[in-house]
A protein has these predicted regions:
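Generic beta-structure capping elements
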Residues: 37, 127-129, 150
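Hydrophobic alpha-helical segments typical of transmembrane helices
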Residues: 36, 51, 58, 90, ...
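Residue-level signal for short, function-critical loop segments
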Residues: 40, 81, 177
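Beta-alpha junction/loop-to-helix N-cap segments that form part of ligand/metal-binding clefts
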Residues: 27, 31-33, 46-53, 61, ...
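Extracellular/periplasmic Venus flytrap/periplasmic-binding protein
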Residues: 86-89, 133-135, 142-239
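Acidic/histidine-rich, surface-exposed loop or edge segments in extracytoplasmic proteins
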Residues: 35-43
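Short, low-complexity disordered leader/linker segments with a strong preference
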Residues: 1-33
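Solvent-exposed, charged/polar functional surfaces in cytosolic regulatory/catalytic domains
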Residues: 57, 61, 65, 93, ...
Length: 239
């Protein structure tokens, strides 16, 4: 996670820890305990591990300056392997066993979709998930703190650049066949519909795999001028 974004989150946390409206689990006179549920193993582990290291770096910086409101920040991470079923188990354990004040640094749309309702149900802040999914933005949820643009905003920027700046209209998409990929697909389709154009081809693949040969063949048959991708890094690298 970008350290500047974490610092912004910490400013918000400073306000939350002083508010009786939020849960007090994980807050003592000396520290604030955060939980992270993310992919620390498996094909998406680079995302989860990178997020964890970024949070730890930002927490370390804050702690060297005295923490937040005089409290040292602590992170307890749990692995979900980028599988929603494991996210549910790990999120419940984080709340019930680790007694965290807030969850931070979730990775992925399907996993956030599994974990966020549990956090919200417990009135626990859900901070900085690595996803631009709409369900975290609409309707407004006071327990969700987003630190990135939505997928719809991002896909609009892609298509605007391709069509306006590069003059490209024959566009295909490679996407992961889950909540993450389907939301990105919807965003691309919306952006293209605004310009009266449509995808010339699409290819999809299952989560937690790099088996994208079939998707590649489907896309290449259409001879697109550009391919946009809504997928983790490793499958895109294979593509």
């Amino acid at each position: 996670m970008n350290s500047m974004r974490v610092r912004i989150a910490l400013v918000l946390v400073a306000g939350l820890t002083g508010s009786a409206a939020f849960a007090e689990d994980g807050v003592t006179d000396g520290k604030i305990i955060f939980g992270q549920v993310a992919a620390l193993t498996g094909p998406a582990q680079d995302l989860g591990q990178g997020m964890r290291q970024g949070i730890l770096a930002a927490f370390g910086e804050a702690n060297r300056s005295g923490g937040v409101n005089g409290r040292i920040l602590e992170l307890k991470s749990r692995d979900d392997g980028y599988e929603p079923e494991k996210t549910v188990e790990a999120t419940k354990a984080s709340l019930e066993e680790d007694k965290v004040f807030a969850l931070i640094g979730a990775v992925g749309t399907p996993t956030s979709k599994a974990g966020q309702p549990i956090a919200t149900g417990a009135k626990v802040p859900f901070i900085g998930p690595f996803t631009g999914a709409e369900f975290l933005r609409n309707p407004y949820n006071r327990y969700v703190v987003n630190l990135r643009s939505s997928y719809f905003e991002e896909t609009e920027a892609w298509i605007d650049h391709l069509t306006k700046d590069l003059g490209i209209s024959r566009i295909a998409i490679l996407y992961q066949d889950d909540a993450f990929g389907l939301t990105g697909l919807e965003g691309v389709q919306k952006a293209m519909a605004k310009r009266n154009i449509s995808l010339v081809a699409s290819g999809s693949f299952r989560r937690n795999t790099v088996a994208i040969k079939s998707a590649l063949l489907d896309i290449m048959k259409a001879q697109p001028e550009a391919v946009v991708t809504v997928a983790p890094y490793k499958p895109v690298a294979q593509f």
